[in-house]
Amino acid sequence: MDLFNYSRRESSEVNIGATPLGGNNPIRIQSMTNTVTMDTEACVEQAKRIIDAGGEYVRLTTQGVREAENLKNINIGLRSQGYDTPLVADVHFNPKVADVAAQYAEKVRINPGNYVDPGRTFQKLEYTDEEYAQEIEKIRARFIPFLNICKENHTAIRIGVNHGSLSDRIMSHYGDTPEGMVESCMEFLRICVAEHFNDVVISIKASNTVVMVRTVRLLVKEMEKEGMAFPLHLGVTEAGDGEDGRIKSALGIGALLADGLGDTIRVSLSEAPENEIPVARKLVDYILTREGHPFIPGKEAPQFNYLSPGRRKTKAVRNIGGDNLPVVIAERLEGSFETNPQFKPDYIYCGGSVPQSRDNNIAYLVDANAWNPEDKNVYPAFNYQQMIELHHTVSDLKFLFLPYMAMNDEVIAALKLHPEVVIIAQSNHPNRLGEYRAMTHELMNEGLENPVVFFQYYQETKAEDLQIKAAADMGALIFDGLCDGIFLYNQGPLSHIVVDTTAFGILQAGRIRTSKTEYISCPGCGRTLYDLESTIARIKTATSHLKGLKIGIMGCIVNGPGEMADADYGYVGAGRGKISLYKKKECIEKNIPEDQAVEKLIELIKANGDYTEK
């Protein structure tokens, strides 16, 4: 794979009804209903809304044989109204349900974590090599008849691994690792290959964006080793709602799309399913603007490990680089210097003049020709044509605005002499990611340890568009371990506070700097038997000030306890109008009436000393 130049991965084509996937087909957009699958009319109407918004596949939960059989009626209801969009059955725990669903849906999703293996209990299991081989044989014995049903009905399948529902067998053998998630998928893929079943799509998802990106990268590598090219379905599970859900999804999915990986995507938002479609479309369309871009002559650094990157080694300059958290630089070239106390930038770039009234908790950047060494907490910012001035200026911190194409021998020599320089990387290239990677890899190849802050310029009028584009542009840089800071500049009507909040949201979604409460919330489906959206809103109202706390809000137990493995507290649907509360992986209280559960959650947080008053 070329780190610096965009091209889509070559994948095999899969026939899914009238809408094929992979190969030379466009990147497909999809969503999932959250209606009760036995309510045919509700499912048909919601599916129509998803399709009318641009959805190309519609998935429905099929928790039992009754639901699987009702897919026939839903399919008829849609086809009778002129819709030929493929339906996808989502199956967990019961392979018999998959057998039935394959007769009525164009694609069936199965979960390797609970297809044959029993549901996850977080118990350590011991196997001899012979016993482990017998477990694989059990999968073969049950899976092959299902593949035969799919062949007879021309039904495609998705092998959908979720971080939250890995089996105890895989967890015991591989641990909670990307390798375990990949092997969980490969066990099933090898059977498909042996049985000459090719209409297979694969996904590996997690709510943790770092885990999700690294695991998909590893999966592609392992498939290449075994001569497989199955198409990829991308998604970040339990991404949440609003700004958080959009940023988290765009960061994780965008990082992979930017490397040419992915044939279909689903943006999982805790909102109405049709709201997911325009977000997904904007993300795909933005990434595809890179197609056919001018060549970037980057050279990969030998110490870089794409599959498991560590943070690039840098020398700390003040509070930037080294072991410091990534910084946020904001611009205030015009308008108010107002900031949100919760999302206060570390540095403000103010162009050619420093404001008279300054915040003592913020440092300032000013153009080098306007810098006064007497100004406290103000630092000079040079452009690449001011190298002589940079040499002669005395300051313990200097900033250098630097495009990749300006990295000549003079600049490299200057950086070697001036470790106090922090680079603000700039790019006007259609593939900014490629140029930014090329720059940081050149720094590594030259043995330079200057920190790098990535400058991202936009002209957006809507907050959602800024969130999607900025997160997509920063994703791979964060997951590659290259980010010492982020500098978002939006020329348009969006307030400075919106831009600042987006920058902090991106760093939190990438798990490299925490600035607020984190919510791991699912989008809901037919298994969710309580009002998810209003519940999330009430929990956020009560807990949004608890910086650093992670709260899982899950519709059901399919991924609940697993995806909440690193959450501090969990709120999980346990039946109609009933909720179970978790502390870490431990269920503390079961079957709480829904109207009491949010208050009980707050009581649990308080009882453990993790609650502070607003």
UniProtKB/Swiss-Prot annotation:
Its EC number is 1.17.7.3. Binds 1 [4Fe-4S] cluster. It is an enzyme of class 1 (oxidoreductase). One of its GO terms (biological process) is isopentenyl diphosphate biosynthetic process, methylerythritol 4-phosphate pathway. InterPro entries: Dihydropteroate_synth-like_sf (IPR011005), IspG_atypical (IPR017178), IspG_bac-typ (IPR004588), NO2/SO3_Rdtase_4Fe4S_sf (IPR045854). It holds the Pfam family GcpE. Pathway: Isoprenoid biosynthesis; isopentenyl diphosphate biosynthesis via DXP pathway; isopentenyl diphosphate from 1-deoxy-D-xylulose 5-phosphate: step 5/6. [4Fe-4S] cluster binds at residues 522, 525, 556, 563. Keywords: 4Fe-4S, Iron, Iron-sulfur, Isoprene biosynthesis, Metal-binding, Oxidoreductase. It comes from the Bacteria. Coiled coil: none annotated. GO terms for molecular function: 4 iron, 4 sulfur cluster binding; 4-hydroxy-3-methylbut-2-en-1-yl diphosphate synthase activity (ferredoxin); 4-hydroxy-3-methylbut-2-enyl-diphosphate synthase activity (flavodoxin); iron ion binding. It catalyses: (2E)-4-hydroxy-3-methylbut-2-enyl diphosphate + oxidized [flavodoxin] + H2O + 2 H(+) = 2-C-methyl-D-erythritol 2,4-cyclic diphosphate + reduced [flavodoxin]. Its cofactor is [4Fe-4S] cluster. Belongs to the IspG family. NCBIfam families: ispG_gcpE (TIGR00612), PRK02048.1 (NF002534). This is 4-hydroxy-3-methylbut-2-en-1-yl diphosphate synthase (flavodoxin). It comes from Phocaeicola vulgatus (strain ATCC 8482 / DSM 1447 / JCM 5826 / CCUG 4940 / NBRC 14291 / NCTC 11154).
